[in-house]
Amino acid sequence: MLSVQPDTKPKGCAGCNRKIKDRYLLKALDKYWHEDCLKCACCDCRLGEVGSTLYTKANLILCRRDYLRLFGVTGNCAACSKLIPAFEMVMRAKDNVYHLDCFACQLCNQRFCVGDKFFLKNNMILCQTDYEEGLMKEGYAPQVR
């Protein structure tokens, strides 16, 4: 957890070991930091500017993106079966996870926008038109076009 606190008396910075004379300081991992000293070990972004959360593992202090990139759980896209990096934005339908580019009707390839209605039938993502056409067929066995 990261917190910004007004400085009441000078404290030593865990990053540079110098006294913190700034008006504000950061407290993270039960240590005090200059705003410029608390950085992600990978991308060097200032963690006080990124948000109020930081991640630690293997003696590294990391931003969310780099933590997920290095240690996050990845999975495979339900449509293309390719690996989805842990930091990538995804779409979900029940237990299935998809790349944003793969989240489309699996019969006509119509891409979905936020708020569009879609259907999951026999583990396939379908647009409303293809879903309704499939319901009209006996036994519903869609053929990929």
UniProtKB/Swiss-Prot annotation:
<dbReference type="GO" id="GO:0045944">
    <property type="term" value="P:positive regulation of transcription by RNA polymerase II"/>
</dbReference>
<feature type="domain" description="LIM zinc-binding 1">
    <location>
        <begin position="11"/>
        <end position="73"/>
    </location>
</feature>
<dbReference type="GO" id="GO:0005737">
    <property type="term" value="C:cytoplasm"/>
</dbReference>
<protein>
    <recommendedName>
        <fullName>LIM domain only protein 3</fullName>
    </recommendedName>
</protein>
<feature type="domain" description="LIM zinc-binding 2">
    <location>
        <begin position="75"/>
        <end position="137"/>
    </location>
</feature>
<dbReference type="GO" id="GO:0070373">
    <property type="term" value="P:negative regulation of ERK1 and ERK2 cascade"/>
</dbReference>
<keyword id="KW-0479">Metal-binding</keyword>
<dbReference type="GO" id="GO:0046872">
    <property type="term" value="F:metal ion binding"/>
</dbReference>
<keyword id="KW-0862">Zinc</keyword>
<keyword id="KW-0804">Transcription</keyword>
<dbReference type="GO" id="GO:2000324">
    <property type="term" value="P:positive regulation of nuclear receptor-mediated glucocorticoid signaling pathway"/>
</dbReference>
<dbReference type="GO" id="GO:0045600">
    <property type="term" value="P:positive regulation of fat cell differentiation"/>
</dbReference>
<dbReference type="GO" id="GO:0035360">
    <property type="term" value="P:positive regulation of peroxisome proliferator activated receptor signaling pathway"/>
</dbReference>
<keyword id="KW-0805">Transcription regulation</keyword>
<dbReference type="InterPro" id="IPR050945">
    <property type="entry name" value="LMO_RBTN_TF"/>
</dbReference>
<dbReference type="InterPro" id="IPR001781">
    <property type="entry name" value="Znf_LIM"/>
</dbReference>
<keyword id="KW-0677">Repeat</keyword>
<keyword id="KW-0440">LIM domain</keyword>
<dbReference type="GO" id="GO:0140297">
    <property type="term" value="F:DNA-binding transcription factor binding"/>
</dbReference>
<dbReference type="Pfam" id="PF00412">
    <property type="entry name" value="LIM"/>
</dbReference>
<dbReference type="GO" id="GO:0005634">
    <property type="term" value="C:nucleus"/>
</dbReference>
<dbReference type="GO" id="GO:0003713">
    <property type="term" value="F:transcription coactivator activity"/>
</dbReference>
